[in-house]
């Protein structure tokens, strides 16, 4: 029998009993729980940053922090009173269910327990463009979320979807992971806009705002521009430093991987990867997920740095099921846990590329006008696709969820520090000494390097290994999502989710209490 080391005054068994009691999705959790419990129990000795030999970066799609974790305890969520706070957004009238400049809408729950077609599991994909997100931000007032959606909503009833959120009942696995490891409530996407430019920041800390190397990149092209960009990306820095790396991509969609729904890992968008014999192509384009990733873990060949793309259908991108995305995260964790020698030296960082058009109440840090590298400087701004004449600021974008999953980040822990996608590159820099030359001075000074998310002072916490598979409980949610997944993703015409009326302001959970990790020690 595994030992019962207490965590924040609560044994592991008590923790999971409490977590299971907090959700109606007990069956779903009963299958995923053992996987997470095994991860929770892995117990390397207290140590240092150098004890982490593998950094695995897994990026999901289009969710804001408030949208997923606004009700999570001890975080900067719906109970936040730090000014300026604008939870009540003007532009939609919940009583008349219509666009109304005088109407006020509060954040409201997407209830995933409702019947087919009207459940909140699969909702319409809000606009999250460079134009739309700058309009929502509104010069820092953060008060224009609903009007910003109107021009991009073919069905008026989908305008207020920007204000929807989930709770523990709707996202049992996400909340269980947040309770078990480190959650970051100050993690922002890198750019006020969509997927491709934010993923470029994740991979390179740059979108070429001066237009010298194929940019600026402000939108998601329908067809990825293969071998078009030429600025330096982080894999090249790792290669030069002799630090092993790979990009693992799910290639289920075949040729569609090079389209707006594929997210091809971005390495093959760069001229440097044109030669299939180059290491950029061999390690940045060829590896598959999950097969090659699982094989490398099994055979002790996992590189020092990995970028993981589970695939669009599992990405949590609206209007696909949110809990199927949870399966993708747990599956990656399960692969790492399959080899304890690898898991004990690994940090898995799960983040989301951008907020997806979903409301977040925290105003992101932004630089003053003219800050080098943080505004688009090409002479003809109107010639830049998707710019709408807006030069910036580029970022930071709005908050997104981020979980740090590692034997060195056992929780429940929280970190309030400011991070963005370039923080993962700064962590690589801190651990392996590899420079991030594209990182601007302003951004380098503004965001942390994520070393504070680890609790290196914590003692080992071994437990009995126990694995199971959650997929059987996620798949039944798919049939009711088929119409919305197609309509809401492709044409943004999903069946609208009706805003409840009368409304009341949501509140946060009061438990569990979250500690602060020690960071470097």
UniProtKB/Swiss-Prot annotation:
Protein function: Involved in virulence. Induces cytotoxic effects on mouse macrophage cell lines, via direct or indirect enzymatic hydrolysis of cell membrane phospholipids. Hydrolyzes phosphatidylcholine and sphingomyelin. Does not have hemolytic activity.
Main localization, broad class: secreted
GO cellular component: extracellular region
Catalysed reactions, as listed in the record: a 1,2-diacyl-sn-glycero-3-phosphocholine + H2O = phosphocholine + a 1,2-diacyl-sn-glycerol + H(+); a sphingomyelin + H2O = phosphocholine + an N-acylsphing-4-enine + H(+); 1,2-dihexadecanoyl-sn-glycero-3-phosphocholine + H2O = 1,2-dihexadecanoyl-sn-glycerol + phosphocholine + H(+)
Lineage, opening ranks: Bacteria, Bacillati, Actinomycetota, Actinomycetes, Mycobacteriales
Region listing for Disordered, in residue ranges: 501-521
Processing and modification events after translation: Predicted to be exported by the Tat system. The position of the signal peptide cleavage has not been experimentally proven.
pH dependence: Optimum pH is 8.
Highest taxon listed in the record's lineage: Bacteria
Induction of expression: Expression is induced in vitro in the presence of phosphatidylcholine. Also induced upon infection of THP-1 macrophages.
Family: Belongs to the bacterial phospholipase C family.
Activity relative to temperature: Optimum temperature is 37 degrees Celsius.
Gene3D superfamilies: Alkaline Phosphatase, subunit A
Originating organism: Mycobacterium tuberculosis (strain ATCC 25618 / H37Rv)
Protein name: Phospholipase C B
EC number in record: 3.1.4.3
């Amino acid at each position: 029998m595994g030992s019962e080391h207490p965590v924040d005054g609560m044994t592991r068994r008590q923790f999971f009993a409490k977590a299971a009691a907090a959700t109606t999705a007990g069956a779903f959790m009963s299958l995923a729980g053992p996987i997470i419990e095994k991860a929770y129990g892995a117990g390397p000795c207290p140590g240092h940053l150098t004890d982490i030999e593998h950094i695995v970066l897994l990026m999901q799609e289009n969710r804001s922090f408030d949208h997923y974790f606004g009700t999570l305890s001890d975080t900067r969520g719906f109970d936040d009173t730090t000014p300026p706070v604008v939870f009540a957004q003007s532009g939609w009238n919940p009583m008349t269910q219509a666009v109304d400049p005088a109407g006020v809408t509060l954040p409201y729950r997407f209830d995933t327990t409702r019947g087919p077609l009207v459940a909140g599991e699969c909702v319409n994909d809000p606009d999250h463009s460079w134009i739309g997100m700058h309009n929502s931000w509104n010069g820092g007032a953060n008060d224009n979320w609903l009007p910003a959606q109107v021009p991009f909503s073919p069905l008026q009833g989908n305008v207020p979807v920007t204000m929807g959120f989930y709770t523990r009942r709707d996202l049992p696995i996400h909340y269980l992971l947040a309770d078990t490891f480190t959650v970051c409530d100050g993690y922002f996407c890198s750019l006020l806009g969509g997927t491709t430019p934010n993923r470029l920041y994740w991979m390179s800390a740059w979108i070429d705002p001066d237009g010298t190397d194929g940019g600026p990149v402000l939108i998601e092209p329908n067809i990825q521009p293969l071998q078009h960009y030429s600025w330096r990306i982080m894999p090249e820095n790792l290669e030069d430093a002799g630090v092993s790396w790979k990009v693992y991509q799910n290639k289920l969609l075949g040729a569609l991987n090079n389209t707006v729904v594929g997210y091809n890992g971005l390495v093959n968008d760069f001229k440097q990867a044109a030669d299939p014999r180059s290491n950029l192509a061999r390690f940045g384009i060829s590896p598959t997920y999950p097969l090659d990733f699982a094989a490398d873990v099994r055979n002790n060949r996992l590189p020092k740095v990995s970028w993981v793309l589970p695939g669009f259908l599992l990405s949590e991108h609206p209007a696909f099921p949110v809990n199927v995305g949870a399966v993708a995260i747990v599956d990656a964790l399960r692969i790492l846990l399959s080899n304890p020698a690898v898991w004990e030296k690994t940090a898995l960082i799960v983040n989301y590329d951008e907020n997806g058009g979903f409301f977040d109440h925290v105003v992101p840090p932004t630089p003053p006008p003219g800050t080098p590298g943080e505004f688009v400087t090409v002479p003809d701004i109107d010639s830049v696709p998707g710019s709408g004449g807006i030069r910036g600021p580029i970022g930071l974008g709005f908050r997104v969820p981020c979980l740090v999953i590692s034997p060195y980040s056992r929780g429940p822990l929280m970190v309030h520090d400011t991070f963005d996608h370039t923080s993962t590159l700064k962590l690589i820099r801190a651990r392996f000494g590899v420079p991030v030359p594209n990182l601007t001075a302003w951004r380098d000074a503004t965001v942390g390097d994520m070393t504070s998310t680890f609790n290196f002072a914590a003692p080992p916490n071994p437990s009995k290994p126990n694995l199971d598979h959650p997929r059987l409980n996620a798949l039944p949610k798919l049939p009711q999502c088929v119409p919305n997944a197609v309509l809401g993703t492709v044409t943004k015409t999903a069946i609208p989710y009706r805003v409840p009326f009368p409304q009341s302001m949501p509140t946060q959970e009061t438990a569990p209490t979250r500690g602060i990790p020690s960071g470097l020690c």
